[in-house]
């Protein structure tokens, strides 16, 4: 990790900014001083599960310990980013708010911004209007911003996907005054994962109506890199990056795509993600499915587009139907369809 950190520092980039993460103790803080970073994350677990059962401290002892390391960081001119671990199981008014208020006093005294990362460690957070604290994402962000007076730009949301709410919770945190949400490439992370970066890039565009300079074709490049270089297996149906996220199998849907892509494609995936809409050919594809596959796979445009009435379409459709009549039950692969097309063409 130290070698990776120094290699990144040697590149000399301003962004993305390199930060570290430590436990709230002197031994870990010594490593931060040696690293030469301008900001460090500090683990400040907030729930009684962590304070009593993991660290065997009282709430006062925990807060004093946390504040001691924060003060040490400020004395060195290092910006603290306090990770309020397990906030969705913490006593919000009994511990979270008083602690956040103390941090804001220190921030005002030192002149350095202290960030607060609200960590939904176990994914218990909910975005529903009227939900009670500590599980309420709106309540957590509103409370930190308005009661503890934490500036929006110093608030972060950190979610987990244990209950399938990681994206909706992150979007809700934005809407209630949290300027930043933590993401990971493809949503990789502990247990069920963290919030996917690609999801929040699309969510941002949906909420703001603009990409603000983002090139989302990079999402596709990132997915390809993660598969090729790191060996990450992406679920075929994972939104925006999965192999089949914009692939339709139903013949009636394929017919709609032929008439107007907007009918059955979520947006212009070719333009925005460099991923043209595709049709998988199987027993239900019919003439429309085969026609769309031919035009999309061979990237035919304008006068080159093959109509549904073309003899090549009907011949290929009949060959596919014959395979399924003989007992095939898997989707046709692009490569085998291409071989069939070239065989028909030579005949």
PLM regions with names:
Residues 17, 41, 180-183:
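Short hydrophobic alpha-helical runs that function as membrane-insertion/retention elements
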Residues 1-26, 278-281, 285, 296:
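N-terminal capping/small domains of soluble enzymes
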Residues 17-20, 82-83, 154-158:
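Short catalytic-loop micro-motif centered on adjacent basic/acidic residues
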Residues 122-265:
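Catalytic alpha/beta core domains of metabolic enzymes, predominantly
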Residues 10-13, 71-78, 101-109, 142-150, ...:
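Generic secondary-structure signature for well-ordered alpha-helical cores
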Residues 210-347:
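A mid-to-C-terminal "edge-of-domain" accessory segment
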Residues 5-11, 26-153, 171-176:
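Alpha/beta enzyme core
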Residues 18, 22, 59, 89, ...:
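Hydrophobic alpha-helical scaffolding
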């Amino acid at each position: 990790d130290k070698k990776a950190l120094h290699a990144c520092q040697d590149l000399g980039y301003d962004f993305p900014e390199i930060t570290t993460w430590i436990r709230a103790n002197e031994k870990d803080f010594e490593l931060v001083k040696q690293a030469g970073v301008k900001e460090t994350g500090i683990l400040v677990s907030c729930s009684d599960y962590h304070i009593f059962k993991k660290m065997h401290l009282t709430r006062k002892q925990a807060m004093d310990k946390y504040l001691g390391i924060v003060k040490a960081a400020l004395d060195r001119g290092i910006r603290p980013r306090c990770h309020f671990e397990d906030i969705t199981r913490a006593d919000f008014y009994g511990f979270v708010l008083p602690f956040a208020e103390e941090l804001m006093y220190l921030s005002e005294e030192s002149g350095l911004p202290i960030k607060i990362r609200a960590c939904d460690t176990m994914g218990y957070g909910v975005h529903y209007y009227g939900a009670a604290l500590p599980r309420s994402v709106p309540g957590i962000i509103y409370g930190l911003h308005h009661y503890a007076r934490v500036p929006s730009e110093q608030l972060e949301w950190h979610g987990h996907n244990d209950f399938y709410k990681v994206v909706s919770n992150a979007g809700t945190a934005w809407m209630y005054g949290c300027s930043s949400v933590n993401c990971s490439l493809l949503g990789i992370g502990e247990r069920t994962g963290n919030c996917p970066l690609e999801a929040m890039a699309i969510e941002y565009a949906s909420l703001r109506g603009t990409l603000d300079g983002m090139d989302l074709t990079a999402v596709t490049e990132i997915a390809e890199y993660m598969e090729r270089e790191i060996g990450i297996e992406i679920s075929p149906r994972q939104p925006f990056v999965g192999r089949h996220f914009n692939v339709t199998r139903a013949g009636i849907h394929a017919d709609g795509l032929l008439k107007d892509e907007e009918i059955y494609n979520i947006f212009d995936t070719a333009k925005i993600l460099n991923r043209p809409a595709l049709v998988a050919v199987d027993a239900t594809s019919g003439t429309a499915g085969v026609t769309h596959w031919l035009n999309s796979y061979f990237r035919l445009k304008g006068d080159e587009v093959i109509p549904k009435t073309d003899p090549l379409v009907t011949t290929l459709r009949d060959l596919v139907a014959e395979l399924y009549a003989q007992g095939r039950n898997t989707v046709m692969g692009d490569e085998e369809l291409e071989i069939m097309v070239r065989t028909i063409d030579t005949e």
